């Protein structure tokens, strides 16, 4: 990756904004927008410990009998090289690479990785194993949703303990002496490459957080979900609305949006219906400007800084262009999000629909409480009489979910509230 591309990506994750301001750019880039005061976030969380910056080609060893590794100076997220891992294409023969450590305390931390996948569809899973000389280890899902690596460019992936896949034996997390990265090929796949550019630990948050969000601005947000949440003692949520859908049958009106914000404390945020990956840069900008103009004109400057990707789809152009319009982009990729998020432009979620069960909610909330991650529950419609669509959640079921959230005792915050309170994790040099 050329130096200017690396710097662009680094500035991206640090919130750097390089384009000239316009009436629809982020409030901090213009003097005409007046966002309400935000609480001052704490100092950025520094890495607890850098485990490997990939600059020593001898530090990592191939521990599996399959696949191969080599230092690669043609692409890197940091320094002058990365570690290239080539898979076998056989799901029964994963490729594992090991890093020996002198003994690192990982009892209370999160993990910070920079990864690049040649083709994410060729990979079933990427697992991080933390252990010692034997086979005892904590096994984590680095990317529970492999779409996180869809762009083929360098991605920052932060991992919370809530992404635990298995505990083998009795690993000593107070003295980890071996880190293993295991890449499992997808079934019927071809050999493919994965690059590892950086690995570190990060401090854990003081508390887990739950957010409730709704996509598309359906009037069930106002008529059904809001009342259920209030009855459960949950104050507010985030509604991601589409400008040209507001006021249509089945969608919230401008008056209802105003009441949701001014009376009930909800945040009204940005969404769209067009697949942005089908557009050129001018088209992407038009979509962003349309929804930001609508939200700013109707008095929602804080929500206007947060965008939910239509159908969860994005590419490098969408990510790059979004920097000048938003503070966060929300995906539909299912994974526990770290606090603070490592990449605010790829926020991961707990995507909920008619298929979601109470046991899944219970498990997600228990892990959120124990491991202090961000559990961001995303819904579409909450219906008294569901129509069978996967995005339609029965009101009785939603009520049980909200009672589970309330009973957990976890703080519930809107997306702008979470993002205001969390300083971005600095991108390592």
List the predicted regions and their residue ranges:
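Extracellular carbohydrate-recognition regions
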Residues: 38-66
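C-terminal domain-boundary segment and adjacent tail
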Residues: 42-46, 188-206, 231-232, 241, ...
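Short carbohydrate-recognition loop motifs
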Residues: 72-92
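Extracellular ligand-binding interfaces
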Residues: 89-99, 103-167
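Metal-dependent polysaccharide deacetylase catalytic core of the NodB/CE4 family, i.e.
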Residues: 208-210, 230-319, 324-327, 333-336, ...
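Conserved, mostly hydrophobic/aromatic
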Residues: 215, 229
């Amino acid at each position: 990756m050329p130096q200017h591309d690396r710097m662009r990506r680094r500035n991206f994750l640090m919130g750097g904004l390089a384009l000239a301001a316009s009436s629809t750019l982020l409030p901090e880039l213009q003097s005409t927008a007046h966002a309400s005061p935000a609480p001052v976030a704490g100092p950025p969380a520094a890495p607890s410990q850098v485990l490997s910056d990939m600059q020593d080609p001898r530090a990592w060893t191939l521990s599996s009998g399959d696949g191969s590794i080599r230092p690669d100076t043609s692409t890197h997220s940091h320094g002058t090289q990365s570690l290239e891992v080539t898979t076998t294409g056989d799901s029964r023969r994963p490729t594992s690479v090991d890093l020996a450590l002198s003994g690192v305390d990982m009892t209370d931390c999160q993990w910070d990785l920079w990864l690049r996948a040649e083709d994410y569809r060729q990979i079933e899973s990427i697992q991080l194993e933390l252990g010692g000389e034997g086979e005892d280890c904590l096994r984590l899902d680095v990317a529970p949703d492999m779409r996180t690596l869809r762009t083929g460019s360098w991605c920052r992936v932060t991992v919370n303990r809530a992404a635990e896949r298995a505990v083998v034996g009795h690993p000593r997390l107070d003295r980890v002496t071996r880190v293993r990265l295991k890449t499992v090929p997808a079934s019927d796949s071809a050999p493919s490459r994965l690059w590892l550019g950086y690995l570190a630990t990060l401090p854990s948050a003081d508390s887990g957080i739950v957010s409730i969000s709704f996509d598309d601005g359906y009037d069930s947000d106002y008529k059904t979900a809001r009342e259920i949440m209030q009855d459960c003692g949950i104050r507010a949520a985030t509604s991601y609305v589409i400008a040209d859908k507001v006021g249509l049958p089945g969608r919230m009106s401008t008056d209802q949006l105003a009441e949701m914000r001014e009376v009930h404390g909800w945040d009204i945020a940005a969404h769209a219906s067009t697949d942005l990956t089908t557009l050129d840069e001018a088209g992407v900008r038009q979509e962003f400007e349309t929804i930001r103009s609508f939200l700013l004109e109707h008095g929602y400057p804080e929500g206007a800084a947060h965008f939910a990707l239509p159908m969860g789809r994005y590419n490098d152009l969408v990510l790059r262009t979004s920097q000048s319009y938003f503070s966060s982009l929300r995906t539909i990729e299912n994974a526990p999000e770290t606090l603070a998020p490592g990449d605010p432009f790829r926020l991961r979620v707990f995507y909920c629909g008619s298929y979601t069960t109470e046991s899944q909610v219970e498990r997600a909330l228990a892990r959120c409480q124990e491991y202090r991650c961000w559990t961001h529950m995303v819904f579409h419609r909450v219906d008294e009489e569901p129509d069978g669509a996967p995005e339609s959640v029965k009101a009785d079921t939603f009520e049980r979910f909200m009672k589970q959230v309330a009973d957990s005792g976890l703080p519930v915050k809107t997306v702008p509230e979470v993002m205001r309170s969390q300083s971005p994790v600095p991108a390592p040099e």
